[in-house]
């Protein structure tokens, strides 16, 4: 991932594949700088703590900000402003911003700030923005197919890359943990049902006892 430059990620609204793509890099950066934070601006979902932790990211290092859209303001203007302030903060090592309606001028400001501050900056936008011009040196388009994340590089420094890159949607460690959690929940449900049946049977026997 380019440090000091914007990486623009284009993806369908229902993909929710951001973490699968950038999680490993974010874990590496935060692991080396335990006092630093990553700022998530206007994420469309709530951070799933086990997902983060099993990606190697401490939840305390993630700061989620949802700026309110003020009446009369240009769409995403407040989210852009928060992203700018985060890029300027020396306690922040990475900014992840969801800016579906950001204008080109705002994106240019973010790209310039990322370069000045030597920060990691990921900007997530809808795939419909692919036809728009962008100051990002790196632009990727994502698609989710079954358990695979397909990544197409549509802009980068150097020669173009025609082939599609395929990545696992979830890392194996996280898949194992989610399956284990599901098994534990299923077992707990079975144990609870067995206990309930036992209690019902006990009450039935008590009601059938004949007083001496």
Model-predicted regions and their roles:
Residues 1-212:
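N-terminal regions of ATP-driven nucleic-acid and macromolecular assemblies
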């Amino acid at each position: 991932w380019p440090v000091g430059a914007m990486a623009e990620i284009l993806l369908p609204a229902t993909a929710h594949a951001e973490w699968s793509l950038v999680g490993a890099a974010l874990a590496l950066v935060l692991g080396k700088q335990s006092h630093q934070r990553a700022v998530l601006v206007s994420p469309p979902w709530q951070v799933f703590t086990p997902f983060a932790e099993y990606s190697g990211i401490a939840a305390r290092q993630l700061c989620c900000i949802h700026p309110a859209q003020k009446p009369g303001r240009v769409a995403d203007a407040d989210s852009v402003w928060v992203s700018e302030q985060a890029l300027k903060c020396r306690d922040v090592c990475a900014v992840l911003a969801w800016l579906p309606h950001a204008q080109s001028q705002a994106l240019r400001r973010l790209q310039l700030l990322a370069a000045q501050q030597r920060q990691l900056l990921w900007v997530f936008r809808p795939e419909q923005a692919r036809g728009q011009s962008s100051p990002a040196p790196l632009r990727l388009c994502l698609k989710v197919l079954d358990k695979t994340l397909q990544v197409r590089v549509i802009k980068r420094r150097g020669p173009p890359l025609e082939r599609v890159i395929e990545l696992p949607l979830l890392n194996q460690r996280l898949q194992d943990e989610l399956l284990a959690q599901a098994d534990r929940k299923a077992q707990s449900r079975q144990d609870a049902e067995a206990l309930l049946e036992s209690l019902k049977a006990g009450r039935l026997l008590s009601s059938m006892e004949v007083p001496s």
